[in-house]
Regions:
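Active-site gating/metal-coordination segments in enzymes
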Residues: 29, 78-198
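Active-site beta-loop-alpha junctions enriched in small/polar residues
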Residues: 37-39, 67-68, 123-127, 153-156, ...
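Bacterial N-terminal signal peptides
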Residues: 8-17
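Hydrophobic faces of well-ordered beta-strands that scaffold small-molecule active sites
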Residues: 32-36, 61-65, 118-122, 149-151, ...
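Catalytic pocket-lining loop regions of alpha/beta-barrel enzymes
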Residues: 164-294
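Acidic (Asp/Glu)-rich catalytic clusters
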Residues: 25, 51-57, 103-117, 136-148, ...
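An N-terminally biased module of ancient metal coordination in phosphate/nucleic-acid-related enzymes
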Residues: 23-105, 111
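Mid-to-C-terminal alpha-helical segments outside catalytic/metal-binding sites
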Residues: 2-7, 24-34, 43, 47-62, ...
Length: 355
């Protein structure tokens, strides 16, 4: 059997999608998805019901959020060629707040039982705007009973940050502190993309954004923060001694509120490119098994195979982890964080109804 097909078979994934294990076996949860985009950079995508169909029995729960940035289509830049991704055009990106209403309406289109499988997130705010926290509270009051977190939103991201209008966000901006303080007060989980370093750094330079990110996390000890992709990106490679840098944070009580997601197909190579990188990643996760979550970072997956790609790419890592640790990363840690957020946010909403 082809290696790819063998892997899909062993996790009960069939060509039609992340579906059900064979009928003669008991269905089992393969993963919960801490990082799923329902829409793309031009606000097109799939419905919540489409996601539910793809989940089958193999995916128990998933986050649900759009992308807060809209790629402009400028005739002077690409003519009749409509860009659908930020790499398709030099035209700017701008913040698109309607994404939150769209996600809320998708969630509300489901039955009460179906809603239990989703954990929607607010993304449609500008993190450099001091009114961003007001937007978050307004969305919660407008759509009570829906949202449980904020993100994925971006501060520093390789090709993206410089395209955003009116300008790039910053870890030093008081608006970000306002957003994170609000999230902590309300009980929202935060999923934040922030590259630890710049693309193609010099060999002697320190990671450009590591110390700033540490300072942000220290300032908000009551806010649950998931650092997306462990701070790496498409062309942002792991920093020197990357695993040791993460370990130093996870053993520091000042970062007890910090978690990392293992996500995005384009960064899987950094974790599984060799037996050595697999061993290093597995050793780190085994040491701190409660601090990592799996996320696909799939963008409006058209079918189950597209959704399963990231999970499959991390196959060597799953094989290297103990069954207990693997289950925590794939399933258990998600449940713990988002169950708590669901309780806390619903309590905040009850105490702060719409005026």
């Amino acid at each position: 059997m082809h290696r790819r097909c063998a892997w899909y078979a062993c996790v009960g994934v069939v060509v039609a999608g992340i579906s059900r294990a064979p009928a003669q076996t008991t269905p089992r949860v393969v993963f919960n998805d801490a990082h799923l985009h329902l829409t793309n950079y031009v606000q097109r995508g799939i419905t919540a019901r489409d996601v539910l169909r793809l989940m089958g029995d193999s995916v128990a729960r998933s986050t649900l959020f759009g992308i807060p940035l809209q790629q402009e289509w400028l005739d002077a830049v690409t003519g009749a060629n409509a860009p659908t991704y930020y790499l398709h055009s030099d035209a700017p990106l701008y913040y698109y707040s309607f994404t939150d209403a769209y996600i809320a309406m998708q969630y509300r289109s489901l039955s009460a039982a179906e809603r239990q499988r989703f954990d929607p997130m607010i993304t449609g705010f500008n993190p450099r705007d001091m009114y961003a926290a007001d937007h978050i509270r307004r969305v919660l009051r407008t759509f009570p009973g829906v949202f449980e977190g904020i993100g994925e939103f971006t501060i520093h991201k390789e090709f993206v940050s410089d395209k955003v209008r009116p300008g790039p966000a910053s870890l030093l901006d008081a608006a970000l502190d306002s957003v994170l303080s609000a999230a902590g007060d309300i009980g929202l989980v935060v999923l934040l993309h922030n590259d630890m370093d710049v693309p193609f750094p010099s060999d002697t330079a320190k990671p450009a954004y590591l110390e700033q990110m540490k300072a942000v996390i220290r300032r908000h000890p009551r806010t649950t923060i998931i650092w997306a992709h462990t701070g790496v990106g498409r062309v942002v490679r792991p920093v020197k001694h990357h695993a040791a840098v993460i370990a130093s944070m996870l053993r520091d009580p000042a970062f007890k509120n910090l978690y990392f997601d293992i996500s995005w197909d384009v960064v899987a190579k950094y974790f599984v490119s060799s037996p050595e990188t697999v061993r290093a990643a597995a050793a780190l996760i085994e040491q701190y098994p409660d601090r990592f979550l799996f996320g696909s970072d799939a963008v409006a997956p058209a079918n189950g195979r597209a959704w399963a790609t990231t999970y499959e790419l991390y196959a060597p890592l799953w094989a290297a982890l103990s069954p207990e640790t693997s289950h925590k990363v794939r399933v258990g840690n998600y449940e713990r964080l988002f169950d708590a957020a669901r309780r806390n946010v619903r309590a905040w909403e009850a105490a702060h109804p719409e005026p």
